[in-house]
Amino acid sequence: MKQLKQILITPLLAALVVISMSGCLRITADELYSLPQVSEQYRRLQQHINSVLSQGAEYAPPTGGPNRQAVQLEDLSGDGIDEVVAFFAFPIDGALKVYIFKMVDGDYVETEVITGTGSAIESVRYTDIDGDGTKEIIIGWQMSAALKHMSIYAIRDYHAVLLGGTEYNVLSISDVDGDGFDDIIALRLPSPETGAVAELVHLMPDGELVKSDTRLSNGIETISRVSAGLLIDGFPAVFVDSEGRFGDGTIATDICVIKDGGLTNVSLKWPSGVSEDTVRNLYNSSDINKEGTIKVPIPRLLQAQSETPYHAIDWYAFNSSGHSRLELTTFHNNNDEWFLILPLDWRGTVSVRREDTVSGERTVVFSYIVSEDGPYRDFLKIHKLTGDMAKEQSMRPGRIVLTSEGAAIYAFELLAPQNSFGLTFDEELIKNNFRLMYSDWLSGAG
């Protein structure tokens, strides 16, 4: 097995030549076997790596995070020349090692070996968090099934200096204080001793590592998604979507910002210790309309035309004081993977139902509510058309094609003159407000 790994390293190093200007190595297995011959300097690097393998090492690529290759390229020193970072495990003594090779006079030279312990290397990230022009290496070590430890290393004269670290379940790297450089947020699930915590790790220009933390909502069981984005007053923030038990719902979003020099959860309410205004049962937070601010979705039950319940989704944006305002409303059709941004004057006046009686057609009907007990006046249908007759079905009189995705065609038809019933709608509005869905908006998705 070791001999096979040594053979495969030759095309892998050729990949380094092909994409050395693009940052971290990303290459498919098929591409490994279709690369040109490599230069002598990469053959020398291969010899260095084979030497490590000959000592009983095995490749140990990170199991998570954005960079998951066993051999990676990254300009750590900021001189425009990529260093090579390679990840190994030594089963005999259980050591995990990260080797750094630098180009010197046309040859790769081993400049540093970072040694850690654990069952695996969970993740690696490279970013300049103190603004000195060089990138720190942030390595996550998988200590056990439930425990991970992060170590932050500065590269000084091509040697790694351990600055500090902390335990975590989920890591988020983003500019939280708005200084133009990334910060580290370590998120920890509840333990028997403490509740869930978000910890800010900030590296000062003088090399001092500063930490501050804030409570997350009581009742968290898993963290499903972490997003970095802006609040409506311009503050950068980290949005932590979690699943658990929060009274009236199973999903909550904690909104963490830097205030008065420390990390603060501005959405948390007392005495419950829960971000109550964000609790719901569906959907992750998102910049749903690509306007620049992250919104929190709160489902609202629509007046029913049948026993099947349907919801509109009200999307709320927050400011740095934790106050929210309604930004927009959508209707999401999860089964057919589309959503529609609803005009404000549809609020409280529109109901929906499904019509799936025609083969190859899945239809949602929007109706104006004449009175609380009905009747309903249909004014819009949106169809998802599939099967051999999809194109013909999309060309029926009155139907207007919105888009296509794979073998599916999405179309709509207006059933009443535009802007009837005092509602805002016409062909252009439906075209502009229709969107396809993506799975990461659903609860529990990454």
Indicate where each model-derived feature is located:
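Sec-dependent N-terminal signal peptides of Gram-positive bacterial secreted proteins and lipoproteins
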Residues: Q3-A29
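Eukaryotic low-complexity, acidic/Ser/Thr/Pro-rich regulatory regions of large signaling scaffolds
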Residues: F421-T424
